[in-house]
Curated annotation (Swiss-Prot):
Glycans are attached at N84, N102, N106, N227, N432, N511. The keyword Oxidoreductase does not apply. Interacts with IGF2R. This is Putative phospholipase B-like 2. Belongs to the phospholipase B-like family. It is an enzyme of class 3 (hydrolase). Residues 1-35 form the signal peptide. InterPro entries: PLipase_B-like, PLipase_B-like_dom1, PLipase_B-like_dom2, PLipase_B-like_dom3. One of its GO terms (biological process) is phospholipid catabolic process.
Length: 585
């Protein structure tokens, strides 16, 4: 006879885990021809509890006699690298990763070790995040053979080109940092798969392994460039809001960001890295400028992806996605001569001391993928309670395929007292080249830089920001049922939960009428907020809240939502978390 249905919370979790494991097994079978996209389960999955403990620390040690690497529990000061994961997802919506490397060892070993220890403390979260987000990518149930083969070939060719460039330029700081980034990814994947083999020469990165977690943003543009039938971003799909606010009298400069993403991506980790890498491969090079950094991130991802970083160099770097709607530009997306955005992002954060240098590093080898508006705030140039320094406080960069435009916008920040970013290009040349004029002609002001709903809400409400708490309030704002700026005249019903600083597209009626897909009901919206200030950034800290906004709206609850059948392993059912000050010791 059939076993009785277990309707308890634990029973539902167990059924979800069994379903996920079955999917994982099937995915491994179907994807074996494409290099096996699903990584082998880590040793943590031999335990009964699918979630990590409240706290876990591990160190990677090098045995001097044998030359072997080994993982040990706890902190060991002579280790190559160490990491602690504090799992507070059920309490705050966040886990916290604190990772450090030992400058007594060479950079390459440090980088590999950083990946190893991160995977060793977060393997359960990595597995669940993989299952929630990318297990079906290129199979088993959404499998476009032609596209997946093209993607695999593109990534293999790009990895091979970068390996050649690293070999041709062994003394280059740029390529040294690219190599360290790939070694960190290699260590992450090796550790998760239960092997520790430090590569001394060339090394391989699986094109459809953990690289998929790093290139989530790049895929938004690789998909249309490689002619995928069903592409990731829908027309008008927003991906983040950001606000930089100069307070009256210049007594503070606040930087805030909220990420718009699928709700399946809500397994979150705030990470702190302390990396003792040198700028270049020789001992005489100084330490990288951005060797200390904190950022909002995801399991198995070695950069932010949101993106939001506080750097020890005094910079805060963040972006919102602008995309590309001009098919003629996809010709610039090629595997040779380009470095994917996720790597350029990391390298710029490591090497730059100011906004201009950051832009110079980032714009090299433009891939035309993960096309964003970047904001680089330099707190070193900001004078609290003082006049405008004239330049250097705010640098804006916009990238699309074949084009990168950069400008110092300090003067504009001091004139208007704010800079808002909401997925539409600021520079006219980028706006026109990316094909947005056609969308304005077809759909109206929704795609306009100055008349978009978020542009108007920011313009109306930015003056209400007085401190970090009121900044959080604005960045979580969504009163779509009552705010006239949230109305969509071509929609039925007209109030639309996408038209807010922090979207809640799950609240749009499923049976409504909408002019384009982004305005429909989706398991998508603003899933966090991060805010920093002069004082917070000085101590590498931020105020952060995880999950969809619930300030003016009912909190999101998986079990009561239209999307309760979506896989969301490891996530709380009810998302009703208040902001927390990130607790670094």
């Amino acid at each position: 006879m059939a076993a009785p249905m277990d309707r308890t919370h634990g029973g539902r979790a167990a059924r979800a885990l069994r379903r996920a494991l079955a999917l994982a097994s099937l995915a491994g079978l179907l994807l074996s021809g494409l290099a096996g996209a699903l990584p082998t389960l880590g040793p943590g999955w031999r335990r009964q509890n699918p979630e990590p403990p409240a706290s876990r620390t591990r160190s990677l040690l090098l045995d001097a006699a044998s030359g072997q690497l080994r993982l040990e529990y706890g902190f060991h000061p002579d280790a190559v690298a160490w990491a602690n994961l504090t799992n507070a997802i059920r309490e705050t919506g966040w886990a916290y990763l604190d990772l450090g490397t030992n400058g007594s060892y060479n950079d390459s070993l440090q980088a590999y070790a950083a990946g190893v220890v991160e995977a060793s403390v977060s393997e359960e979260l990595i597995y669940m995040h993989w299952m929630n987000t990318v297990v079906n990518y290129c199979g088993p149930f959404e499998y476009e053979v032609g596209y997946c083969e093209k993607l695999k070939s593109f990534l293999e060719a790009n990895l091979e080109w970068m390996q050649r460039e690293m070999e041709l330029s062994p003394d280059s700081p740029y390529w040294h940092q690219v190599r360290l980034t790939l070694l960190q990814l290699k260590g992450l994947e090796d550790s998760y798969e239960g092997r520790l083999t430090f590569p001394t020469g060339r090394f391989n990165i699986k094109p459809l392994g953990f690289l998929l977690l790093q290139i989530s943003g790049d895929l938004e543009d690789l998909e249309p460039a490689l002619n995928k039938t069903n592409t990731k971003p829908s027309v008008g799909s927003g991906s983040c809001s950001a606000l930089i606010k100069l307070l009256p009298g210049s007594h503070d400069l606040l930087v805030a960001h909220n990420t718009w993403n699928s709700y399946q991506n809500m397994l979150r980790i705030i990470k702190k890295y302390r990396l003792q890498f040198r700028e270049g491969p020789q001992e005489e090079y100084p330490l990288i400028a951005g060797n200390n950094l904190i950022f909002s991130s995801y399991p198995g991802t070695i950069f932010s992806g949101d993106d939001f970083y506080i750097l020890g160099s005094g910079l805060v770097t963040l972006e919102t996605t602008i995309g590309n709607k001009n098919p003629a530009l996809w010709k610039y997306v090629q595997p040779q001569g380009c470095v994917l955005e996720w790597i350029r992002n990391i390298v710029a954060n490591r090497l730059a001391l100011d906004g201009a240098t950051w832009a110079d590093v980032f714009r090299r080898f433009n891939s035309g993928t993960y096309n964003n508006q970047w904001m680089i705030v330099d707190y070193k140039a900001f004078i609290p309670n003082g006049p405008s320094p004239g330049s250097r406080v705010l640098t804006i960069l916009e990238q699309i395929p074949g084009m990168v435009v950069v400008a110092d916008k300090t003067a504009e920040l001091y004139k208007t007292t704010y800079w808002a970013s909401y997925n539409i290009p600021y520079f006219e040349s980028v706006f026109n080249a990316s094909g947005l004029q056609a969308l304005v002609a077809q759909y109206g002001d929704w795609f306009s830089y100055t008349r978009n709903p978020r542009a108007k809400i920011f313009q109306r409400d930015q003056s209400l920001v007085e401190d970090v708490d009121t900044m959080v309030r604005l960045m979580r704002y969504n009163d779509f049922l009552h705010d006239p700026l949230s109305l969509c005249e071509a929609c039925s019903p007209k109030p639309n939960a996408e038209n807010a600083i922090s979207a809640r597209s799950d609240l749009n009626p499923a049976n409504g009428s909408y002019p384009f897909q982004a305005l429909r009901q989706r398991a998508h919206g603003g899933i966090d907020v991060k805010v920093t200030s002069v004082a917070l950034a000085k101590y590498m800290s931020m105020l952060a809240a995880s999950g969809p906004t619930w300030d003016q709206l009912p909190p999101f609850q998986w079990s009561k939502s239209p999307f309760h059948n979506m896989l969301h392993m490891g996530q709380p059912d009810l998302w009703m978390f208040s902001p927390v000050k990130v607790p670094w010791d």
